[in-house]
Curated annotation (Swiss-Prot):
Species for this entry: Arabidopsis thaliana
GO CC aspect terms: extracellular region
Residue ranges, compositional bias (Gly residues): 85-98
Protein name per UniProt: Putative cell wall protein
Keyword vocabulary terms for this entry: Cell wall, Secreted, Signal
The keyword Secreted is annotated on this UniProt entry: yes
Length: 140
C-alpha cells in the first residue's frame, strides 16, 4: 500500500512540475530588441492630449513649463502701438529743427531729485551755455 501511495505522490509532484514549467513558457511574450519610437500612444478621451514639458521640484510637486514661442517677439511702442525699429525708447526732438534732444515732454529732466524746481540736463544742446555748461539758476 505504501508503494502505491509513493508512486501517486511522485506522479502528482512530476505533474505539478510539468504544468508549472508549461505555464511559465506560455506566459512569456515576444519582446522586440529595438522598440519603435514612432509608435507613441496617447489617450483619446474627448480630446487628444499630448504630454507637456514638466519640471519636478522635490518636496513641492510637478509644474508645467511655459510653452515655447512660435513667433518671435517684437517690441512695440505702448503709446502709438507701432513697432520700434531701434529697440529702445524713441527720442523726442521737441518739435524743433533737426538733432535729437534728450528731454521728453512731461518727464523729469533733473539728474538729482530736487522738489523745488526743474533744471535742464547738462548736455550739449538746448539750454546749455556757450561752452557746454549749464548756466546757474538765478536766486530770488
Amino acid at each position: 500500500m505504501a508503494s502505491s501511495l509513493i508512486t501517486s505522490a511522485v506522479i502528482v509532484v512530476v505533474l505539478s512540475l510539468v504544468l508549472g514549467s508549461v505555464e511559465q513558457v506560455s506566459g512569456l511574450r515576444h519582446v522586440p530588441k529595438s522598440p519603435k519610437t514612432t509608435d507613441v500612444k496617447h489617450p483619446d478621451f474627448l480630446v487628444t492630449i499630448e504630454p507637456k514639458p514638466t519640471i519636478l521640484i522635490p518636496g513641492v510637486g510637478r509644474f508645467l513649463l511655459p510653452p515655447k514661442c512660435k513667433k518671435p517677439f517684437y517690441p512695440y511702442n505702448p503709446v502709438t502701438g507701432a513697432p520700434l525699429t531701434g529697440g529702445g525708447i524713441p527720442s523726442y526732438n521737441g518739435g524743433q529743427g533737426a538733432g535729437p534732444h534728450t528731454q521728453l515732454p512731461g518727464g523729469d529732466d533733473t539728474l538729482v531729485p530736487n522738489p523745488g524746481f526743474e533744471a535742464p540736463t547738462p548736455t550739449i544742446g538746448a539750454g546749455t551755455g556757450s561752452n557746454g555748461q549749464v548756466p546757474p539758476v538765478p536766486l530770488p
